[in-house]
Amino acid sequence: MSREDASQIVEQGDIFFFYRPKVGAEEVSSAEDVQRFYMVTALEEKDRKYRLFILGRKKLPEIVEGKSTSEERNWALNTLTTNNPEDIRKELLAAEYETETKGKRRVAAAAPAGEGKYSIVKHDNHTEFVYALELPEVPGPIQREFEIKKEASYIMSVKNPDIQIPGFKTFEKRTPQYPESLKKEFGDRRWINIEDPKLLDYENTQLLLIGARKKDVEEELGINLNEEKETANTAEIFRELKIRKDQVPLKPLLKGEFPGKGEQQPMAAEVKQLSREEAPGRGGKVGGKAAATRAPSAAAIAKLLSGINFPKRKNELIVHAEANKAKVEAAEEVIQVIKELPERTYSNMADVEKAVAEVR
């Protein structure tokens, strides 16, 4: 069987990557300064369909040729599917909300970090999510930070919402409302391939991405993504999604560079107002992972870290938590949160709880 015979395109279109800085961040120099990392797909068909996904760990899975790593897999969560690109644009706007202790807070608009073409391909006995980057022409520091490659592919599977899986317990109250016709496709399997792309259309659809390849992707799969040479004047991200150039920093998209201090938050003409329930950390779409999942209780974290002698680095927190797994129900869920904490030294439990609030 030839490579071309082995691959079948399930769907294809345009892909866009965005990141949103943390509340109050004046400058972004790494993923630690980022609240959310987004992926937007725009299906290539007469009636365009747009999907907004949140990526876990604030980056794509790592791909290391010929080597398996702990970072090679990641989750993605559908938070919006629409036929109107204006809905996507509004989700990415700057936002303001009121807090009881600090008054009005502002969240910067999501900044574009990449544009390209994507395909979902049925290959042998699995499906792969494939993309080729058009902007920036040469990936820079900001793309490396989010693991955005010039081209890459990932084995992609959809989670059965009726089966609880270790590491996905945080999603148990966020389940996609599939019709019976799609539910039947899962049977008793935990994960299924994406042979029907409608599986991706439902809010709260949960995906697993496993890094597969990062070079010669089109040749290996026998497909053509039809990527084009784009500029600031031709970029689909501005034409298709109606993102205004004066409202977002352009360096990440066009040069692959982090914006300098004062460049991260242009004077946006449009700012949406959030309720307290929509605010970061309260379940809203603007926040960190907490906005997509339930944050673990402080008591659960304290149990896993009981007996620890501070100060400790993050890796030491993880080791201690792993040793105390038997003390906490759904310990893997809590340990996953600890793994997402910023790389720094923690002086006490208050430091840990503050960091949890940053990522959740």
Question: Where do the protein language model's features map onto the residues?
Answer:
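Intrinsically disordered, low-complexity juxtamembrane tails/stalks of eukaryotic membrane proteins
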Residues: 88-108
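A eukaryote-biased signal for long
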Residues: 103-279
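A structural detector for beta-sheet-dominated domains
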Residues: 18-20, 56, 78, 121, ...
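Basic helix-extension-helix modules of the SAP/HeH family
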Residues: 272-360
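Conserved beta-strand elements of beta-rich interaction domains across eukaryotes
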Residues: 22-24, 44-48, 57-62, 82, ...
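Acidic, aromatic-enriched beta-alpha/helix-loop junctions
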Residues: 47-93
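Intrinsically disordered, low-complexity coil segments
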Residues: 26-30, 44-46, 66-67, 325-334
